[in-house]
Amino acid sequence: MSTASLFSFPSFHLRSLLPSLSSSSSSSSSRFAPPRLSPIRSPAPRTQLSVRAFSAVTMTDSNDAGMDAVQRRLMFEDECILVDENDRVVGHDTKYNCHLMEKIEAENLLHRAFSVFLFNSKYELLLQQRSKTKVTFPLVWTNTCCSHPLYRESELIEENVLGVRNAAQRKLFDELGIVAEDVPVDEFTPLGRMLYKAPSDGKWGEHEVDYLLFIVRDVKLQPNPDEVAEIKYVSREELKELVKKADAGDEAVKLSPWFRLVVDNFLMKWWDHVEKGTITEAADMKTIHKL
């Protein structure tokens, strides 16, 4: 049985997206936008592999022979931002090291991350199923986009959470083909932060301070199959049905641990604010919720 057949609501496969999914970004209401931020520069171009990263690739070839080539490149090219439990920057390391459970446990490696929750003008939430080639949590269903700000000038800006917003805009394009004009950085509303740890398998896992960003926009989608297997807009009730299937042990309906933490602790009350146009009232960026 296919994954899509398990749900009572429509799904959209990468190579057959329905035209109705896309609409002009002009329909977004300004009531959801936080105060305007200063214009920003485009994210810095990706650089070539460092000597350290190249050496790491060479040394781990035998251990990670089955890793997808794109994911392998990102594992060593991307430098995550290391933080302490108060979200203070303490350094940086490769995405590879930051997701090795051995490193996480031995060195308490903790990195900064973000999770985007994008709603359309009907207040439906866009979900994605992670691609089968993802190193951590392949083929699980999760929120719109989950990734990391990188250790680069434009994504280290602390003021107004601008660095994380810049990273979110970058990854929405990388994963879902959403152009920057459809998701202006000043329309992301940071609602909170949570600290969690979640092993994916015996080798890989997550240990993150995760920024939770909400945005209401109608966008055009062109998902990247290296990152995303499937996408789907869901209503609140449809999401509840999805959670029930996951709780029943349906192997084809697995949810990412960070998404489940947000669903269980925050999402439904925040969804109320989305529908009322009062989303900024829900923001609490002083607290780091340890879950």
From Swiss-Prot:
Pathway: Isoprenoid biosynthesis; dimethylallyl diphosphate biosynthesis; dimethylallyl diphosphate from isopentenyl diphosphate: step 1/1; Porphyrin-containing compound metabolism; chlorophyll biosynthesis. Signal peptide: none annotated. A motif (Nudix box) lies at residues 147-177. Residues 20-39 have a biased composition (Low complexity). The keyword Chloroplast applies. CDD domains: NUDIX_IPP_Isomerase. Its EC number is 5.3.3.2. InterPro entries: IsopentenylPP_isomerase_typ1 (IPR011876), NUDIX_hydrolase-like_dom_sf (IPR015797), NUDIX_hydrolase_dom (IPR000086). Substrate binds at K95, R130, K134, S147. It catalyses: isopentenyl diphosphate = dimethylallyl diphosphate. Keywords: Acetylation, Chlorophyll biosynthesis, Chloroplast, Cytoplasm, Isomerase, Isoprene biosynthesis, Magnesium, Metal-binding, Photosynthesis, Plastid, Transit peptide. GO terms for cellular component: chloroplast; cytosol; plastid. Its cofactor is Mg(2+). One of its GO terms (biological process) is photosynthesis. This is Isopentenyl-diphosphate Delta-isomerase I, chloroplastic. It comes from Arabidopsis thaliana. The lineage of its organism: Eukaryota, Viridiplantae, Streptophyta, Embryophyta, Tracheophyta.
